[in-house]
Amino acid sequence: MKPFLIGLLAGLCLLSAGCGKEATPPPPAAFYSLHDSTGKEIVLTKKPEKIVLLSPAFLNIMHAAGGDFVAYGSSPSLDAPDYAKGKVNLGYSYQINMEKLIGEKPDLVIGLKGLHNPLASSLEANHIPLMLLSISTKDEVAQAIEIMGDVSGHTEEGAKASKEFQKEIDALSRKVPDKGMTCAVIFGAAHAVMLAKEGTIATETAKILHFQNVFAKEGASEMHMMPFSMEDLMKKDPDILFLTTMVTPGQEKKVFEEVLLNQPAWQELRAVKEGRVYFLPQNLFLSSPGIDYPKAIRCMAGQVYPEMRF
């Protein structure tokens, strides 16, 4: 009988996961996790209460998803929306005031991939998570709407806004005839003129409207821009030319005059002869319009097809 009791006690010890030791409780589940546009895993242990948006393009995305923010990066070419009033302005998106940003003690900062990567080390040193997102394409914007709905605790609202956003863009794309027309997007800055390849707002909008960018696959695959060449432009001779700039409003034509408009070869281009040269406004094409992507599509479509209503 005694050996039996000893065996019984031993079995009970095993079933209770060890005599004299308490079971370790499992770690609490994270509130949210994802891999951002850089491939980095972001894990939020709880719902963020103080979200900072480093790009003005994120403001209308977060608003559409039903979320809120405490501070934001601004733009010299865009007025802050009414729902940004009372929030902390951290300066221009490309020149964020880090002292102000860290002073806000945010529990999540959302920035643009590429532009805000250099801020990662400073934020990490202050134990502030940084999520970097790309929002150049319609699919990236649609995903960003859902992400901002998730992190702000408005998952259903974000999913609904994302679905409506995609539905509107698809309807606009179907409305425009696919005539197999080709295009080139020329980007002008104060000291340089470039040809856009893929991954810019203008090239992605053109793709939605069935315009084939003749320089999409040229040059290094990882670059969005390539050096301008009149010779290359003459060889491709696209049906449409879109011009977009990063200069002071009102100076758009001036930046192109010497390199393009005053060149004899410019007048020989088919798009110039047929009157298919269009300037794209900075407020829609310089940086991502975010939730206003359909406005960029309507703008471009309306220039090429003025007889149609968008």
Residue ranges with predicted function:
Residues 76-79, 195-224:
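Alpha-helical, coiled-coil/dimerization segments enriched in small aliphatic residues
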Residues 31, 40-43, 118-194, 215-216, ...:
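Extracytoplasmic substrate-binding proteins
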Residues 20-31:
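Bacterial Sec signal peptide processing site at the extreme N-terminus
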Residues 35-39, 88-99, 220-230:
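Short helix-initiation/N-cap motifs at beta->coil->alpha
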Residues 98-114, 128, 229-243:
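Proline-aspartate-enriched helix->loop->beta-strand connector
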Residues 15-18:
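C-terminal motif of bacterial Sec signal peptides marking the signal peptidase cleavage site
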Residues 2-8:
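Sec-dependent signal peptide recognition
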Residues 53-104, 108-113, 211-214:
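A short, structured surface patch at a secondary-structure boundary
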